[in-house]
């Protein structure tokens, strides 16, 4: 890891010195983490930019896998025109050792590196680290090897002390959408869990105490989209109407639910930072992607993308249809 001072002639300073291919990775995930936990950056700056936190991956005990590399066409690799080369990387198969992971912090002013005192069991994972809005509180998310126990710790980046804030356990496994649906606010944070059989939204204070369960029912919350502190409303997407569809909703502080998307099909939303507006991306079996700008009550203000030409072209084709059958537990 290097730091570059953009305001001082792009001068560089080296943070870590033990990185080596197929041995130690600092701040970037190994193959398993990229593939299974869907992220490619394992470092975070504190909100005041005084501290850098990163995950260290020690791959030295992970078995290697090698496959041949040929010249190919695009891209063409000239050195392999006559004889193939090979590529070797760390690839743990079932039951083999994973990388040993640890969390470290770097004080940018004093240049002191510290290892966080994280109680991670043998073979455990650290799928995310993220600073809260408090620069002295680093959130560390962990999973056990079986991936059926999730722990959220808050760590002091200087003292390295960790405190368990939330633990979530499952008889089967913890879904990966937990990680990125945790959003931190000054005094609270969001959390999603299948603890009652369906994936629902929960609201915690910053110390890890449950305030309330925001959503409930026989449906799944797909994504938490944000919270508006001015009116106390929560915004999210769910498949409440049908497992085959998704829609955008909000719930106010009194628990009143309002559907914000007006089209039947697949809806996803991107909200402005003040939660006053959102872009809604919609599509269905017979309607190509339409993107609209809406206010936070669901009113469409303008259409940004309508794909009218593509829709007109598709009108000349027969679209697929589907039938929904309900199976009973006794059916085979």
What are these regions (language model features)?
Residues 5-6, 41-44, 53-59, 93-97, ...:
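Beta-strand C-termini and the immediately following turn/loop, strongest in propeller blades
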Residues 15-43, 51-115, 297-311:
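Predominantly five- to eight-bladed beta-propeller fold
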Residues 62-65, 102, 147-153, 198-202, ...:
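Structural motif
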Residues 39, 99, 125, 178, ...:
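Beta-rich catalytic cores
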Residues 323-330:
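Conserved small/polar residues in nucleotide/adenosyl-binding loops
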Residues 12-20, 114-117, 163-167, 212-215, ...:
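Beta-propeller fold detector
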Residues 22-38, 121-126, 171-178, 219-223, ...:
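Short glycine-/Asp-/Thr-/Trp-enriched loop segments that recur within the blades
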Residues 6-8, 108-111, 157-158, 205-207, ...:
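Short loop/turn segments that connect beta-strands within beta-propeller blades
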């Amino acid at each position: 890891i290097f730091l570059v001072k953009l305001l001082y002639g792009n001068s560089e300073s080296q943070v870590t010195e033990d990185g080596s291919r197929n041995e130690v990775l600092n701040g970037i995930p190994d193959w398993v983490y990229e593939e299974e936990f869907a992220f490619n950056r394992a470092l975070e700056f504190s909100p005041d930019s005084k501290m850098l936190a990163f995950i260290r991956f020690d791959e030295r005990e992970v078995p290697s896998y090698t496959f041949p590399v040929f010249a190919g066409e695009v891209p063409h690799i000239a050195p392999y025109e006559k004889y193939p080369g090979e590529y070797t990387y760390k690839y743990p198969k079932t039951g083999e050792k994973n990388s040993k992971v640890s969390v470290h912090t770097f004080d940018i002013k004093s240049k002191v590196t510290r290892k966080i005192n994280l109680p991670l069991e043998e073979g455990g994972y650290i799928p995310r680290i993220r600073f809260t809005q408090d620069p002295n509180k680093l959130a560390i998310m962990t999973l056990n090897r079986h991936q059926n126990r999730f722990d959220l710790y808050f760590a002091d980046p200087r003292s390295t002390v960790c405190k368990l804030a939330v633990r979530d356990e499952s008889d089967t496994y913890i879904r990966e959408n937990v990680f990125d649906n945790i959003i931190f606010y000054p005094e609270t944070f969001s959390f999603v869990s299948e603890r009652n059989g369906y994936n629902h939204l929960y609201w915690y204070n910053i110390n890890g105490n449950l305030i309330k369960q925001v959503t409930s029912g026989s449906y799944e919350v797909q994504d938490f989209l944000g919270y508006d502190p001015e009116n106390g409303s929560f915004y999210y997407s769910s498949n409440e109407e049908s497992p085959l569809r998704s829609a955008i909703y909000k719930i106010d502080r009194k628990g009143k639910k309002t559907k914000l998307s007006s089209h039947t099909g697949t809806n996803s939303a991107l909200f402005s930072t003040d939660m006053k507006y959102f872009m809604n991306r919609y599509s269905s079996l017979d309607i190509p992607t339409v993107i609209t700008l809406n206010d936070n009550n669901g009113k469409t203000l303008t259409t940004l993308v309508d794909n009218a030409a593509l829709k007109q072209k598709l009108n000349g084709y027969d679209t697929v249809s589907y039938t929904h059958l309900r199976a009973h537990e006794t059916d085979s």
